[in-house]
A protein has these predicted regions:
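Structured alpha/beta reader/binder surfaces that contact nucleic acids or chromatin modification marks
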Residues: 1-119
Length: 119
């Protein structure tokens, strides 16, 4: 499985991005939860969607089971984990349409390097 980090490729590559929120279908959410439950924790990071001529730029390992979170519950501490592109939580919420009740899937991970231990 893969995730595209189109807006935050540099932050993914330098390891500072450790969380991403996605507006995924129930099916996609369940697939990621199943991967966690089955111990399939390593996945590919891409610079953009492969259908848009993206390329694989690295690998990452899930560090928590994917979960859903209301945008209004977005912790300020996650601004840096999301790549640091948004100065405030409200800026991030506005990017997502401004609805604090919108629910997104949260994926927490760490970027793997060639010598990263996979636990």
């Amino acid at each position: 499985m893969l995730i595209s980090f189109a807006w935050t490729t540099p932050q993914f590559l330098d390891g500072s991005k450790t969380a991403t929120r996605r507006d995924w279908s129930d099916l996609t959410f369940k697939q990621w939860c199943k991967a966690w439950d089955e111990g399939r924790l390593t996945h590919d990071g891409w610079d953009k969607n492969p259908r848009c001529k993206g390329k694989k730029v690295g690998r990452f390992m899930l560090t928590a089971r994917p979960y859903r979170e209301r945008l209004g519950d977005f912790p300020e501490s996650d601004l840096a984990a999301e790549g640091g592109l948004w100065p405030t939580v409200q800026d991030y919420i506005n990017l997502q349409g401004g609805d604090q009740d919108k629910v997104l899937v949260v994926i927490r991970f760490r970027k793997l390097t060639e010598d990263s231990p996979i636990e």
